[in-house]
Amino acid sequence: MKPVKPPRINGRVPVLSAQEAVNYIPDEATLCVLGAGGGILEATTLITALADKYKQTQTPRNLSIISPTGLGDRADRGISPLAQEGLVKWALCGHWGQSPRISELAEQNKIIAYNYPQGVLTQTLRAAAAHQPGIISDIGIGTFVDPRQQGGKLNEVTKEDLIKLVEFDNKEYLYYKAIAPDIAFIRATTCDSEGYATFEDEVMYLDALVIAQAVHNNGGIVMMQVQKMVKKATLHPKSVRIPGYLVDIVVVDPDQTQLYGGAPVNRFISGDFTLDDSTKLSLPLNQRKLVARRALFEMRKGAVGNVGVGIADGIGLVAREEGCADDFILTVETGPIGGITSQGIAFGANVNTRAILDMTSQFDFYHGGGLDVCYLSFAEVDQHGNVGVHKFNGKIMGTGGFIDISATSKKIIFCGTLTAGSLKTEITDGKLNIVQEGRVKKFIRELPEITFSGKIALERGLDVRYITERAVFTLKEDGLHLIEIAPGVDLQKDILDKMDFTPVISPELKLMDERLFIDAAMGFVLPEAAH
């Protein structure tokens, strides 16, 4: 049963309290939630109202949740408040780990749970808006979303196949089914009395328009949270990102903040102010900076790259320290282009950003092979060069944009530490010292589930590196080759004994560049791109 929309009076969009708005959500509805980590574009007031209503009335029941981007704080925010038995029965997310209460329901087999690559998921919403049955893509071939593996299913109670293997002109593709949502929770900064909305205080746009179109064109209700309303037709047309006819309900929250906590809006993050070049932003010399420094060595002048969340996200600050940050462009899958990448849960809240695309268009560029290089963090690596990030130690994290980005980038740089779990290192006298070894080996013999396929990368002619604080590997047809080790570490004791398989030792094995281990600017000069 489709939800019943509140009527417009004289063209004005209905303005309701959040509590009144969620009363329009029927049982069994499919709810699509906009937002990214740290509160970016999160309609928190609507989410809270829905969670509170269910606690009090046990309605609505058996919702299906679609969340393209990981929103939350890796604890109790985001869509975690909706993790109540009976409220949610089914979920399809691009990323799961930012809202771990929902992940726990999936881990406990209490909900049906799917994971599409983040870019693919937003493209299926665009397909739903156009009344197309789904999308056909080679993104995800050879990974756990491939139906010959797990087909994107995250637990034992998830049975229906949403992804199918198809073939055109003797080439394999994946068909991803598009799910049309009934309800949207989206957010903007300002709207007029007819619902036309602008995003002036927001960090980015994500796929707000795509979600609104998908819900509207399938007879659903678009609920939009804003910080303020203004008179009809007073917003600049070039600033309007959501046309009013897509919006069915507006909820005004005058206390809406750009991110979780803090000031209502940071003008550097919204792009209104530019951070002066003299402003000192630096990382202490530790294993995180060491990995970022070595990763920077893989960059070339004029390259367009992507940087992912985690240990990889320090590369922008290292480039700024070295004075070469303007010689290449780093992008984030959620839309930002250029600038200084943020770190932590509000990843993508950049400063000095050069441009911001909608997320769906950003992924179109990635899928088409537009990236020269990408920097992604890894959880586990196996002897075939496969990488796992979406599920490990029994925890569901989801892929985010990892599969979308790594599938076609010309050079792929995986960043991480060789071991995990209480690893402590120090860098002194130009050497790396292992003060306390990590409890967990991250280089294992076989991955149970694959997020990046080494085999497919080699077939596509991609250049793959794995950079850790003590060793650098490259991927070849016969597996991982160890090509560099850190000064101060023992090859056998500190590297080979801490792996569950033995890599090929390169005959040209060398020490990592000594400049990486000095607590001063490296004097690094970005190489020219090869032609």
Curated annotation (Swiss-Prot):
SMART domains: CoA_trans. Its EC number is 2.8.3.8. It is an enzyme of class 2 (transferase). Keywords: Transferase. The keyword Transferase applies. It catalyses: an acyl-CoA + acetate = a carboxylate + acetyl-CoA. Gene3D superfamilies: Glutaconate Coenzyme A-transferase. The keyword Lipoprotein does not apply. Transmembrane segments: none annotated. GO terms for biological process: ketone body catabolic process; protein homotetramerization; short-chain fatty acid metabolic process. GO terms for molecular function: acetate CoA-transferase activity. Signal peptide: none annotated. The active site is at residue 333. InterPro entries: 3-oxoacid_CoA-transferase (IPR014388), CoA_trans_fam_I (IPR004165), NagB/RpiA_transferase-like (IPR037171). Homotetramer; dimer of dimers. Belongs to the 3-oxoacid CoA-transferase family. CoA transferase having broad substrate specificity for short-chain acyl-CoA thioesters with the activity decreasing when the length of the carboxylic acid chain exceeds four carbons. May play a role in short-chain fatty acid metabolism in E.coli. Formation of the covalent enzyme-CoA thioester intermediate proceeds via an unstable anhydride species formed between the carboxylate group of the catalytic glutamate of the enzyme and the carbonyl carbon of the thioester linkage of the substrate. This is Acetate CoA-transferase YdiF. It comes from Escherichia coli (strain K12). The lineage of its organism: Bacteria, Pseudomonadati, Pseudomonadota, Gammaproteobacteria, Enterobacterales.
